[in-house]
Amino acid sequence: MFDAKAFLADVPHLPGVYRMYDAKNTIIYVGKAKDLKKRLSSYFRSQLASKKTEALVANIHHIETTITHSETEALLLEHNYIKENQPKYNVLLRDDKSYPYILLTKHQHPRITSFRGSKKVAGEYFGPYPNAGAVRETLNLLQKLFPIRQCEDSYYKNRSRPCLQYQIGRCLAPCVESYYSQAEYDNQVNLVRLFLQGKDGQVIEHLVQKMENAAQELDFEAAARFRDQIQSVRAVQEKQFVSNERLDDLDIISIAYQHGIACVHILFVRHGKVLGNRSYFPKVPNNTDLSELADTFVGQFYLQMNQHRTIPNQIIIDQPLSESAALADVLSEQAGHKVSIADKNIRGDKSRYLALAKTNAEAALTLQLKQDTHIRQRYDSLKTLLNLAEIKRMECFDISHTMGNQTVASCVVFDENGPLKSDYRRFNIEGITGGDDYAAMEQALLKRYSRHLEEEKIPDIIFIDGGKGQLNRALETFASLNVSWDKRKPLLIGVAKGVERKAGLETLLISKWDKEIHLPPDSPALHLIQHIRDESHNHAITGHRKKRQKAFTESGLESIAGVGAKRRQALLKYLGGMQGVKAATLEEIQSVPGISKQLAEVIFDTLQHS
């Protein structure tokens, strides 16, 4: 039993971080404190604040502390420990994907495109947007409003005449010198920049001036073009709520909580416009109060700087934060600009945004509760069918290829909450006879399971998308494993498609019973299995298509020694693309600038035998 009195005797009255461990030496909670002794003493009073704290204290085996220079340093260190260890009793942010941005490249003819990741590419970044869909929607809108290019640089460099985008009025064709005016292209780029900065009024003023100048010069075709642009921008304005107040960049956060599930909804406001929104469902230990949830979520969300999140000028939240001043100082230091946090007395348009965030949070939570109930019903049905006391983790495998080429295997993971997408995996299958799905499945299973697995990562069920042959190969593969974990734990189940390959006609092959089961089409257990199988199928197909597309787009020139990027570009340009290169004679290849006779022979021979 943990001797709290002896431990507390040596804890100093200094700021720092503490880590609580259980008997398995696993970190179960990470916290920080302005005064470590006072904070840690509060856990061992006779009357504890909540049942959650009681459960936490009952599991403490030992505690480690790290003294820091300041509360600010403790805050940063705390979130690093939480992110690294994912402790059981901490609120955990599950979705830590980086946000997409719109990038306006630094180029003679700038390109506008979506971007996610570290901002290493030179150019101007606008955002963040809540998801890739919001970026695509904005890019589609921009292409209709402002005719600047969105094509890849490699495509742009190899054009000898305008593409379809020019013909339908969505690009000025800067790739072809005789078709565009540099001044007009620069003008359109500037309009895009102003539009993305939220300065719609300046965009319209500029276009009105251009329209009037064109009319005075009797260039009525250009005047009509500018008129249409003005109408399009105004139509976009009418669809958006734009604040009359002068607002900086804001993130508006509202928290809804019911039946042990929390929804944190964020509105991203930039230049007075709502760029988009996103709902998060953090993992919340039982009996967690909302103030702790708010503190932990905001800290984790903005301090995970490796996710390339942009910290706004102001964060507005509808729950009081216990350490808003310290958190604002840390965020200001991380962001390189002043960051304020407002958790009370919100007025004006900001209160309207907060009300909107609250409505969205409550709606998203209601939907999530319904979905969770639905998922639990399906899980209960599957547990009853298989006579299992619990199902914590399920994995499913599928194989995808085209006539035996570019074979990819997928593994998707489900837990009690549904798809666990952070644990999804794909495996490139190599060194087998093309089209041998049994060998592909064996290789995928070996890649996945022939190594050490943590206890919680061992699946209770493994679904194999295939019939008796696939299941038997999977059983043989498992029998051959030499691993430290219990390889007998997972229940292997084959999911064979019906004769007509229609949903609802699947046959389940249960390995432990050595028999087939046909479930009725309205069975909740069958619906869960279909969901898992379809998810695995889609994941495999997506990976296969990417691999196939890569093989298709890689011209075959990449593997030829002596043919670098410039020579590839010259070959494609002078011979009319890859089809032209493959159809070219030896003499035609040799005539391309930079290609010697010897290199031309190598290129010709390689392509003829590929």
Curated annotation (Swiss-Prot):
Q: Which InterPro entries match?
A: GIY-YIG_endonuc, GIY-YIG_endonuc_sf, GIY-YIG_UvrC_Cho, HhH_motif, Hlx-hairpin-Hlx_DNA-bd_motif, RuvA_2-like, UVR_dom, UVR_dom_sf
Q: Name one Pfam family in it.
A: HHH
Q: Which residues constitute the signal peptide according to the record?
A: none
- Gene Ontology CC, one term: excinuclease repair complex
On whether Flavoprotein is a keyword of this UniProt record, the answer is no
Picking any one GO molecular function of the record gives: DNA binding
Question: SMART domains per the record?
Answer: GIYc (SM00465), HhH1 (SM00278)
**What SUPFAM superfamilies does the entry give?**
C-terminal UvrC-binding domain of UvrB, GIY-YIG endonuclease, RuvA domain 2-like
State where the protein is found.
Answer: Cytoplasm
Q: Where is the UVR domain?
A: 201-236
Residues in domain GIY-YIG? 13-91
Q: Which GO terms describe its biological process?
A: nucleotide-excision repair; SOS response
Q: Which UniProt keywords apply?
A: Cytoplasm, DNA damage, DNA excision, DNA repair, Excision nuclease, SOS response
Protein family per UniProt: Belongs to the UvrC family.
Role according to the record:
The UvrABC repair system catalyzes the recognition and processing of DNA lesions. UvrC both incises the 5' and 3' sides of the lesion. The N-terminal half is responsible for the 3' incision and the C-terminal half is responsible for the 5' incision.
Q: How does it assemble?
A: Interacts with UvrB in an incision complex.
This protein's name? UvrABC system protein C
Species of provenance: Actinobacillus pleuropneumoniae serotype 3 (strain JL03)
